[in-house]
């Protein structure tokens, strides 16, 4: 059996910071995993280096579930984004190793393909509704069947999801957190008009999505969901802060707009009530934040019992390693819904060469063995770590608000 002989962490910043774990075995086979936690990368590096890697050496690389349980239960201070990102990186790397030894693309070890490809959604944004829709039309012309719409809000200087670049968005943009002002009322007056204009310009064949980014109260979210109903959005994402799962019950009482949440969740316990009571339609837990493929499969299986589909987070704070892992997962589960997809920069793709491809609105992980992605450490070394914080938001009276 292949024994783990070495493991190391590589940190690189080809436009944004990524944390990669590389595990080597006695067979000469290695695997890679993503441990990136946007804006808080170095704590995960420390956790891996000081606490996880020493415990891996000498272990059987095939015993993925046992190693997962060892790292989760053995820590005692379990869960949380740092711990679960570290476990996720180990898990991805071990699945990569197992599939390479088997000579198969990972999705074949996960039960084989349930579909021919993975429907993804792109991000269209702009300072105005008109600019957002112009960019959405570009995505539609590229073959996307689903597009997330985010637009500037009149009277607010900066808004979540609206970037300087039309197609690349990195919110962690400052050596210290940048601040923006927020007005819920201005936003609620503006958002329905975005979707009305979108249906007029783009038609009804496209799936349209929207991210509220945890900024509303339950009753405000119910109001927005109700206002959006005539335009049939695919989902309303992260309508309220995710900590209070009971909030979604109130939203459900006021709207039939589908609800999605979960990118900040770290385990099945974070979403158990939401899924069990069918308070959401899509669970957005992601492979790098929720403990890797092993644990994400358990979340998906539980969700499948309650008719909840997956819609995994897939912004550029996931490296191509995590994106590849997500695609193998997506391809293999019965209750897949949709996958977020933001293209990486050319520099990032050079650091992380990968086999997955986009065609006609869908991604496919490819048939290379393992995850089908690697890290070019020579290229990675050209881009040293650069401290970057996520922004913060304040209300117009100066008080803090959820970003």
UniProtKB/Swiss-Prot annotation:
Key words, A-Z: Carbohydrate metabolism, Lyase, Magnesium, Metal-binding
Catalytic residues (UniProt): 160, 213
Binding-site list for Mg(2+): 211, 237, 263
Cross-referenced SMART domains: MR_MLE
Function recorded in the entry: Catalyzes the dehydration of D-mannonate. Has no detectable activity with a panel of 70 other acid sugars (in vitro).
InterPro entries xrefs: D-mannonate_dehydratase-like, D-mannonate_dehydratase_GalD, DgoD-like, Enolase-like_C_sf, Enolase-like_N, Enolase_C-like, MAND, Mandel_Rmase/mucon_lact_enz_CS
Family designation: Belongs to the mandelate racemase/muconate lactonizing enzyme family. GalD subfamily.
Domain of life: Bacteria
Top EC class of this enzyme: lyase
GO MF annotation list: magnesium ion binding; mannonate dehydratase activity
Source organism of the structure: Caulobacter sp. (strain K31)
Protein name: D-mannonate dehydratase Caul1835
Cofactor binding remark: Binds 1 Mg(2+) ion per subunit.
Enzyme Commission no: 4.2.1.8
Residues engaged in binding substrate: 38, 123, 263, 284, 313, 317, 340
Essential cofactor(s): Mg(2+)
Any one Pfam family match given in the protein's UniProt record, by short name: MR_MLE_C
BP term (GO), one: amino acid catabolic process
Gene3D superfamilies: Enolase-like C-terminal domain, Enolase-like, N-terminal domain
Catalytic reaction equation(s): D-mannonate = 2-dehydro-3-deoxy-D-gluconate + H2O
Pathway listed: Carbohydrate metabolism; pentose and glucuronate interconversion
